[in-house]
């Protein structure tokens, strides 16, 4: 099995040496035996014995080697964000584009379970092959992120809100990576709560350092803080999952009963919330925006 480890988790040219039932038999560059389920082969593909084709090689749960032409988002040499399918006591199960899911072991996740990723979050990972030829997800280290992020060496992003994901959590602060490749650090004094590992967040940029890394904040600007009426509406929106059946044409009596304010005060308050992009006003309802949710203190 020692030779097999050289090709597991990577893209290789394999020779087609036979067909056994519905399974193609392939041979690796070092003579490794690899199987390919016929269900993994596109209808237009017609493999010829003795010819070599490009495949991704992965182990099944028993350690036997299988191949696929559906190239995954990550390999043992490539990092990318992978979607979390579920979490359990073993860790986080992720989808990397293979016929089987891949586990990020619990030992690699935060010590506080409330900071573990949830289904739908994305983890920055690569593939790791252990001594028993099993395949796991490995979280990106700080060294890896430093080698791949896009530096920003000016103030062009100042006070801009950027979508990013948490890839590393420490007591001193949260480390984020955006879709554009920006690396962002949020000091613990600039957050009300800590995001989950892999959670998508909106972060306001407040500066940068000499390495081109951005500094961010989860706290609103002073002029974005809400007045009393706005805070009442915001708190109720959070309590009712981000949606309330009220708008500027709702009856004064209904507004008074629910919000304990006049219709004029209500209209002014939702107008301010809308201008700050904290809510959307739709026919018959108001809803929290992504920016609005980013203000929530869990």
Curated annotation (Swiss-Prot):
Organism field: Staphylococcus epidermidis (strain ATCC 12228 / FDA PCI 1200)
Name recorded for this polypeptide: Conserved virulence factor B
Signal sequence region: none
InterPro entries with a match to the protein in the record: CvfB_fam (IPR014464), CvfB_S1_2nd (IPR048588), CvfB_S1_3rd (IPR048587), CvfB_S1_st (IPR039566), CvfB_WH (IPR040764), NA-bd_OB-fold (IPR012340), WH-like_DNA-bd_sf (IPR036388)
Family per similarity comment: Belongs to the CvfB family.
